[in-house]
Amino acid sequence: MPIKRFPLLLIFILISFNTISAQFFNFGRNKVTYEDFEWKIIQTEHFDIYYSGEFLEIAEIGAEYAEEAFDEYKIKFNDIVTRRIPLVFYNTHIQFQQTNITSGFIPEGVGGFFEFLKGRVVIPHMGSLEQFRHVIRHELVHVFMTQKLFNIQKDRRITNRKMPPLWFIEGLAEYWSYYWDTQAEMILRDAVLNGNFIPLKDMLRIYGTFLMYKEGQNFLMFVADEYGEDKILKMMENIWRFSKFEDVIEYTLGETIEEIDEKWTHSLKQKYYPLYQNKFPHTVGSNKITEEGFNFSPAI
């Protein structure tokens, strides 16, 4: 699996099950801006936070979330971002879709993005502070990872910069920004039990999908449990050694990619397959009582 290069200019977080990647840029269409934004700024120790309208209270909460994440990530990454980080907050997703920070169209399923060239993080408030915190933390993982990888390769005078594959980038952002919640559990359990789970070597088949995010997150949870949390950082620190990320994984974990993949897959089967015990397919274990129409409110 070749390592992805820096032309990945925008890194997105998905907030739905839609298959969304950089492919959503629609050429030949014009982005319409409905509102004029009068920007204000909050400056904290590490961030320049831009907001508009009557959004000060939420922006201040976002500032606290960002500083909290900064203190945590400088330890996790064993590195620090020395430049000031611009955070751009929008009051709603509709306003977020009008942003001129990217010329591309932003679908409803995108909950924020990190723009690589100028290092800007752009996030809408969707009405949930928990989700707002999650997205801020997710995007700041991208900021720290980008800085970490840049420093590692700069110190070794490597000019052809390397990046991990998207499943690792997004998987780590999810793993270090949020807990393994019931939605993640539902997605992975469904994939394993219904034959839709994709092993590492075939991860490109689900490139940019919500399943890719959750499989990447779960794989890194597996690495932390099986090989040690420190191995995740080691994979980033070893990226300069190889042209293929599979080789980075093998070198860091000390096993072949096939062995690692098999262990991960087997652990998930052990966890989820027992759920089939005493279960029957609906066509076998139940009787169809209606032939036509839809049952919107079945009686119990």
Q: Can you say where each PLM-predicted feature lies in the sequence?
A:
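Surface-exposed helix-capping loop/turn segments at secondary-structure junctions
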Residues: I75-R83, D225, E229-I232, G285-K288
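Short amphipathic alpha-helical interaction/hinge segments
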Residues: K148, A184, L188, W264, ...
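Juxtacatalytic substrate-recognition/specificity segment
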Residues: A22-T159, P164-P165, Q183-A184, V248
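Bacterial Sec-dependent N-terminal signal peptides
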Residues: M1-N26
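Extracytoplasmic/secreted envelope proteins and their assembly/folding machinery
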Residues: A63-F70, K74, R133, R137, ...
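Beta/coil-rich, acidic/histidine-enriched accessory regions frequently appended to metallopeptidases
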Residues: N26, N30-K31, W39-I41, K234-E237, ...
